[in-house]
Every structure is written in structure tokens, then in C-alpha cells.
Amino acid sequence: IDKFSKSLIISNIEVLLNYCMRFYERQFITREEMNNDVLVRFEQLLDEYMDSGKASLYGIPTVKYFANKICLSPNYLGDLVKSETGKTAQEFIQLKMINVAKNALIDPNLNTKQIAEMLGFQHPQHFMRFFKKQVGCTPKEYRNQNVATA
């Protein structure tokens, strides 16, 4: 092998990988209607998971769970959600969890432990840490701010 063979092989492999990436990305563009159907199905499954109490039984929802339900790989579902919404599938799930938590925190009859269990957290401290990281305040602070303004 001469001194140019290695660089030629590398260049050809790079071209092949670029073609692979091109075709992979193109499928998200050319299948827009089907992608929207998958996204709607993902949202429906996520709503059903949170509303049915499955989170308290099975834990925090995962991308893998929903990908299996939709018959896609977790990576493909993640890429599809990212291309359609700009958010990763995990961020999408977390956003839904935060919205459910915010609605639950407005109800004075639910304490933080109950809300944490409802969302699938095994420990209220994990929920409080998650909530503060996502929202910027603790669940108690959020509740106090929103009860005061209601």
C-alpha cells in the first residue's frame, strides 16, 4: 500500500458515511405526514400513561417504553421527535411530567409525596430535585406562588 491509499480509503469511507447520514435525515423530511401520526400517537400514549396511573405502578415513563408501544427503536423515536419538535423524546416526556406536576401542585389536597408517587418517583426528594431543575423553584415555592395568585 502506498502513502496515498490510506487517505483515499478514508475519503471514500467518509463519502459513504455522508450518504448514509443524508438518507437517514431525508426520511424525516419525506415522511412528514407519517411522522406527525407517530408524534400524535406518542403524545396519546404519554397522556394515557400519566392519566391512567401507570406512572405510580411502573415508574417514570421512558422513551424505550413508548418506542416499544409504537414499534420503533428508542433511537429512531428520539430522532423523529427531535426533528419534529426540536426537543428530545426524553425532554418531551419531562415537559409532560412537569405540566402534570404543576396542575397537581395547584390542588391543596395533594401533598408533595403523593404527587411524586403519581409521577412515578420512588422518593419525593428525587421529584423535588427534578422539579427544581426543570422549573427553577421547589414544588412548595411553586405551590405558594400559584395559590397566592389564584
Predicted features and spans:
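Amphipathic alpha-helical segments enriched in hydrophobic/aromatic residues interleaved with Lys/Arg
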Residues: I1-V15, Y19-C20
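…primarily DNA-binding HTH/wHTH and HhH modules…
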Residues: R129-A150
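Terminal helix-turn-helix DNA-binding modules in bacterial transcription factors
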Residues: S83-Q122, N144-A150
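Residues within helix-turn-helix
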Residues: K64, N75, N111-Q114, P124-Q125
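Residues within the alpha-helical elements of helix-turn-helix
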Residues: K69, M118-L119, Q134
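A short, Lys/Arg-enriched amphipathic alpha-helix from helix-turn-helix/homeodomain DNA-binding modules
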Residues: I10, E32-I70, E91-L110
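Short hydrophobic/aromatic patch on the recognition helix
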Residues: L77, H126-F127, F131
